[in-house]
Amino acid sequence: MPITPFHIIAGFAVKSIFNKHFSWSIFALTNIIIDVEVIYYIFTIGEASHKFFHTLIGSSIIAFSCAIIGIPICERALKFWNNNLQNEKSLAKLKWLSTESDISVVSSFTGAFVGAYSHILLDSFMHFDVKPFEPFFSKTFVGIISIDSLHLSLVGLFIFGLIVYLFRKFR
């Protein structure tokens, strides 16, 4: 499934621990951009195909690009998000969802590269055609962990991240 939410929610645990040093919005952007290739193949050949962007070389190029280009894009999106939460028509109960809109270069690169490498690692457990180390060798990790166990682990990471986030936000 392209742009699976499981990739993105797993990053929430990293964000909750490394708050200022990790951009979750850049992490999410990187995950989405990596799957643009899969969406392209769905529309052109009629099936999901994981190719160049799902290798270390391809995902590194995407991560570097997202780390640079993503800062102004994500900062603008976060400012829009925060402004809408501060809107007088917004429910006061939702204002706690506002977040820091400034993204440092360090947090951008951390979010982008953790996003890219975790994406191809997770996909290599689920899809036979993901070979992260190509063109050097064609190793896949399918079967090491069941997809159900993988999904449960990612949901568990999200719940852990949510607990840490809420604890830090309201202490």
Model features per residue range: what roles?
Residues 1-171:
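N-terminal membrane-targeting hydrophobic helices
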